[in-house]
């Protein structure tokens, strides 16, 4: 089972401007062959189908699979932020000469507007649907680890290319975070393969790059984010049995296996978009949802008070 935390793994700063083109490029990092949906599903299935007694490797897979769920959420929310404000508000006296969604005709992906109500979709940058055929699980531990390393390396390569396509702050923040986390995951799988007899020497990481020209990436590396992996569980994990000691790459890093989950960041709250008929709630329906929200707030407050009383 999995538990849900209503936060994102990294903060998304406000977008500089509506940017449907950057949103479309980032779709590759979500639903592409080497995107976050692929890594999430591949590691989940390798975890669920794991055979044998080498459970530390299964714990490793489970921790990264769980992290990738948060990456899917992060990229989806970033795409939404990049699309926010791209269309015009719905005029109060709408008539034929006013077309609040005309921007969709010039957008690189009309489905962002026509199908998804100005939101992300499970597709790549060319609009191709995400495919289950991307998922690799041979049942062989060494083969799976090798393939996962290749997946992380290719994903990082593509994100380094994405970094150079847009300087939009929201876009850059998420892409930079994923560049650093993909490097950490390269190290996780490389270290796992080291314990299985592989000597990497100087072959990795992929790509080899000087991040001094990427200030957002450099800032995250300065807090050792590229050498850390969380267990994403409150229970005992064998992750630290594998992910420890020196980095498997020739970079002088020291690896950290950390219990629990990373500190999160707020999830952006998208406003209603009447021109998209989203959320589509009229006055009466809004009153009903506000009542539900008030009930939820009261319940949470009551629960917190009860817990505090018990502690006394």
Question: Whereabouts are the PLM-identified features?
Answer:
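Non-heme di-metal
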Residues: 1-312
């Amino acid at each position: 089972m999995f538990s849900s935390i209503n936060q994102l793994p990294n903060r998304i700063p406000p977008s500089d401007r509506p940017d449907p083109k950057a949103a479309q490029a980032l779709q590759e990092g979500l639903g592409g062959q080497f995107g976050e949906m692929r890594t999430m599903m591949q590691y989940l299935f390798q975890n669920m189908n794991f055979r044998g007694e080498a459970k530390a490797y299964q714990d490793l897979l489970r921790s990264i699979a769980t992290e990738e769920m948060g990456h899917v959420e992060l990229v989806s929310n970033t795409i939404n932020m990049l699309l926010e404000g791209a269309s015009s508000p719905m005029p109060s006296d709408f008539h034929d000469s006013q077309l609040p969604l005309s921007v969709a005709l010039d957008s690189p992906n009309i489905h962002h507007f026509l199908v998804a109500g100005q939101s992300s979709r499970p597709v790549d940058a060319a609009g191709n649907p995400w495919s289950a055929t991307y998922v690799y699980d041979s049942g062989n531990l060494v083969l799976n680890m090798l393939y996962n390393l290749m997946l992380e390396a290719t994903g990082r390569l593509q994100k380094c290319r994405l970094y150079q396509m847009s300087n939009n702050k929201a876009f850059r923040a998420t892409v930079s975070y994923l560049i650093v986390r993909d490097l950490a995951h390269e190290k996780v799988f490389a270290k796992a393969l080291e314990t299985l007899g592989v000597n990497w020497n100087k072959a990795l990481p992929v790509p080899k790059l000087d991040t001094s020209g990427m200030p957002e990436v450099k800032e995250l590396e300065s807090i050792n984010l590229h050498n850390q992996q969380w267990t994403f569980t409150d229970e005992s994990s064998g992750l630290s049995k594998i992910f420890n000691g020196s980095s498997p790459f020739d970079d002088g890093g020291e690896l950290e296996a950390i219990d629990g989950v990373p500190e999160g960041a707020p999830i952006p709250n998208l406003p209603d978009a009447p021109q998209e008929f989203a959320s589509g709630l009229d006055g009466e329906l809004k009153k009903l949802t506000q009542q539900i929200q008030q009930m939820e707030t009261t319940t949470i407050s009551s629960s917190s008070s009860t817990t505090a009383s018990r502690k006394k």
